[in-house]
Amino acid sequence: MLEEAGEVLENVLKASCLPLGFIVFLPAVLLLVAPPLPAADAAHEFTVYRMQQYDLQGQPYGTRNAVLNTEARTVDADVLSRRCVLMRLLDFSYEHYQKALRQSAGAVVIILPRAMAAVPQDVVRQFMEIEPEMLAMETVVPVYFAVEDEALLSIYEQTQAASASQGSASAAEVLLHTATANGFQMVTSGAQSQAVSDWLITSVEGRLTGLGGEDLPTIVIVAHYDAFGVAPWLSLGADSNGSGISVLLELARLFSRLYTYKRTHAAYNLLFFASGGGKFNYQGTKRWLEDSLDHTDSSLLQDNVAFVLCLDTVGRGSHLRLHVSKPPREGTLQHVFLRELEMVAAHQFPDVSFSMVHKKINLADDVLAWEHERFAIRRLPAFTLSHLENHRAGPRSSIMDVRSRVDSKTLTRNTRIIAEALTRVIYNLTEKGTPPDMPVFTEQMQVQQEQIDSVMDWLTNQPRAAQLLDKDGTFLSTLEHFLSRYLKDVRQHHVKADKRDPEFVFYDQLKQVMNAYRVKPAIFDLLLALCIGAYLGMAYTAVQHFHVLYKTVQRLLLKAKAQ
């Protein structure tokens, strides 16, 4: 039999029997020469940033899961159940997000552009409005954000094409496409999220002591440094509240120079406080007040507090608003400061619209609106300066709050307004006859835009979510070092949640590596098995009836020779 098979093979090769040779040799040739998929096409690894997960006042917020291992689809697909739904920011909407959740999607991955500053403003505004809605509801679906690259964009486009074809084709076309199309299995490398125990929220305090007796009035300047957004690792907080911290640091620099010389050393204590946990109901400020007012006898807050000025989101726009819980009474230093702000804005910066916004404290709310309300609850006169009209404005809690949203000239202008008004209060310049249109900070003492820009660049060069800023990290050590250059008695204050009844709980696994593996659908294995079975059946039949095949080939060869 083997001799006959060899003779047939030799005859086939001599006669160039192409159809038969094609059938016999094609499978082997394909197996030998078919190249494997390139590594970049077979799998792609990229970094993903998980949506917020935290508990505040016992209420859970954000996504509760971190593990992902499911096949990718886009929102155009008819069936999203147990699928990883890919969405691009430019096509994202709250309706699409809700559709994925309603259909019990396995996960949601939102793909962000590489250059956030280039995103159209209507898309930015829309997403800023959606972010609070996404966080307001607890979800068990893992929600991730990824920054697009070429490979990830290619994965999205291929998945979108596959999803769209399934919705528009006939049943037979869908079956064929399902059997032959490529898919992507999305897998995260991390474990399930766990609560972080003993996490510390850190605040930094420093002071400039006034010249004179012990009972000098104290002006407190406060700004929280942490940022907030739907994803902690993407929360840069340029305007909210990088701008507030930038102004606080510049004020510390300016007044430290004034307090260096006896001739300009004022009879006011200046207390600077860079608070942590501002986006989590002002936890750093709350603990600082408790420690200063309830547990110590040597705090400046226990003495003659003139007023507390909180700085929050002052980096853009032509408006400045002083938010108060109770309008200042005439004759008080709070009212004097309000009047000075109005005069400086009107006479030196007429393009700025200044106003006061009165909002009572609602103790029934889980989260206070503004930071000054923490002080007002403890009966300390306080207000917040911001360009925002209300505390619910989108820029206060958005990953879209990037460096480009802060206008350097506007931030410098607002810093000058605040510095001029404070100086007029501290040195009583209006009562001494200084014209309102005469600037105080000029020449060597002027507000430095370069300094403010460098601080803003530093602040927005890293995410500043409260869950990410360790007390021994470089950010807090740099902030403390910066304040130590200009202030005295600089020190840290720490807040740790109570173990039995914690006010806040943070969770880990906020940044992971995700792998996208190119896979064939399960039905492809069935189709491949059928094809292999058919081929083996044909080969078996050919072997069993080899004598018939041999005679047929001989007959064909004789006819060829006869011709």
UniProtKB/Swiss-Prot annotation:
Compartments, as annotated in UniProt: Endoplasmic reticulum membrane
MF term (GO), any: ribosome binding
Source organism, top-level taxon: Eukaryota
CDD domains the record matches: M28_nicalin_like (cd03882)
TM helices/strands, residue ranges: 523-543
Regions of this protein lying in the Cytoplasmic compartment: 544-563
Pfam families, per database record: Peptidase_M28 (PF04389)
Any one GO BP annotation for this protein: regulation of protein complex stability
Name of the protein in its database record: BOS complex subunit NCLN
Principal localisation: endoplasmic reticulum
Family according to the record: Belongs to the nicastrin family.
Described purpose of this protein according to its UniProt entry: Component of the multi-pass translocon (MPT) complex that mediates insertion of multi-pass membrane proteins into the lipid bilayer of membranes. The MPT complex takes over after the SEC61 complex: following membrane insertion of the first few transmembrane segments of proteins by the SEC61 complex, the MPT complex occludes the lateral gate of the SEC61 complex to promote insertion of subsequent transmembrane regions. May antagonize Nodal signaling and subsequent organization of axial structures during mesodermal patterning, via its interaction with NOMO.
Keywords: Endoplasmic reticulum, Glycoprotein, Membrane, Signal, Transmembrane, Transmembrane helix
Membrane topology (UniProt): Single-pass membrane protein
Signal peptide: 1-42
Residue numbers on the Lumenal membrane side: 43-522
Glycosylation sites: N241, N428
Assembly notes: Component of the back of Sec61 (BOS) complex, composed of NCLN/Nicalin, NOMO1 and TMEM147. The BOS complex is part of the multi-pass translocon (MPT) complex, composed of three subcomplexes, the GEL complex (composed of RAB5IF/OPTI and TMCO1), the BOS complex (composed of NCLN/Nicalin, NOMO1 and TMEM147) and the PAT complex (composed of WDR83OS/Asterix and CCDC47). The MPT complex associates with the SEC61 complex.
GO cellular component: endoplasmic reticulum membrane; multi-pass translocon complex; protein-containing complex
